[in-house]
Amino acid sequence: MPELPEVETTLRGLLPYLTNQLIYSLTLRRRTLRWDIPSHIESRLPGHRITTVCRRAKYLLIDTNAGGSLIIHLGMSGTLRLLAPETPLRPHDHVDIMLNNRRVLRFNDPRRFGCLLWQEDGQIHPLLQRLGCEPLSDSFNGDYLYQCSRARNVSVKTFLMDQRIVVGVGNIYAAESLFRAGISPLCEADKISLQRYRRLAEVVKDILLYAINRGGTTLRDFLSPDGRPGYFKQELFVYGRQQQPCKQCGSLLRQTTIRQRTTVWCGHCQG
């Protein structure tokens, strides 16, 4: 599933080409993804402009002057690409937004776990109402994590992936952050010191920013809007490397399951 760096990479690729563009048409080839796509957007959006594009957690918000914003989530396998209008359709090309710069924004989602929803101006969609802190913001720091973790009797990996605490950190970046901070993913969240949480917050920010600069992590489905893969996969220390030698100490990496998620860590470096 695309995590924050992949969504941020998509945002940065789209923003220069979508801002202030007039929407000529919107074509829905499928009416339902994870949830029903609001049918009114087909008639509501043409003739209006995209004012900006932003990100909240793993959601992309395409703001318009039509009185609201499109909310897009890429789900497990979704991609957004900017294409020439004559580009042949591929299987699972569900949505086209035709723009006045002779480009079409095409949403492809083979597994259909993504979504395309609508948020009226002045309202906050229910999906966005309980989201936690943005990890690249100034408010995300070790003190914040420490305070949120008190009386939280869950593993630190589960805690770090809780979107009500911090958004956009999924299995890949939680595993990598905990490794580089030297914290076992099995450690209980409320047993970790303030000093170690401060280190963890720094590492999370550093890894996310580095992954964004590397175009995200392409494991199977993710491509940036220009069709290029992300290259952070080459930098992974633990994720997906179970039973391989630790790049740092040479010990065999361990594997377990935490909340139905495969978790890989180094028993020596994260002891």
From Swiss-Prot:
One Pfam family from the record: Fapy_DNA_glyco
Cofactor note: Binds 1 zinc ion per subunit.
Cofactor dependence: Zn(2+)
Gene3D superfamilies: 1.10.8.50, MutM-like, N-terminal
EC number(s) reported in the record: 3.2.2.23, 4.2.99.18
FPG-type ZnF: 237-271
Binding site for DNA: 92, 111, 152
InterPro entries assigned to the protein according to its UniProt record, in alphabetical order: DNA_glyclase/AP_lyase_DNA-bd, DNA_glyclase_Znf_dom_DNA_BS, Formamido-pyr_DNA_Glyclase, FPG_cat, MutM-like_N-ter, Ribosomal_uS13-like_H2TH, Znf_DNA_glyclase/AP_lyase
Catalytic activity: Hydrolysis of DNA containing ring-opened 7-methylguanine residues, releasing 2,6-diamino-4-hydroxy-5-(N-methyl)formamidopyrimidine; 2'-deoxyribonucleotide-(2'-deoxyribose 5'-phosphate)-2'-deoxyribonucleotide-DNA = a 3'-end 2'-deoxyribonucleotide-(2,3-dehydro-2,3-deoxyribose 5'-phosphate)-DNA + a 5'-end 5'-phospho-2'-deoxyribonucleoside-DNA + H(+)
UniProt keywords, alphabetically: DNA damage, DNA repair, DNA-binding, Glycosidase, Hydrolase, Lyase, Metal-binding, Multifunctional enzyme, Zinc, Zinc-finger
Active site positions: 2 (schiff-base intermediate with dna), 3 (proton donor), 58 (proton donor), 261 (proton donor)
Subunit composition and interactions: Monomer.
UniProt similarity note: Belongs to the FPG family.
PANTHER family tied to this protein: FORMAMIDOPYRIMIDINE-DNA GLYCOSYLASE
Name this polypeptide is given: Formamidopyrimidine-DNA glycosylase
Record organism: Xylella fastidiosa (strain Temecula1 / ATCC 700964)
Lineage: Bacteria, Pseudomonadati, Pseudomonadota, Gammaproteobacteria, Lysobacterales
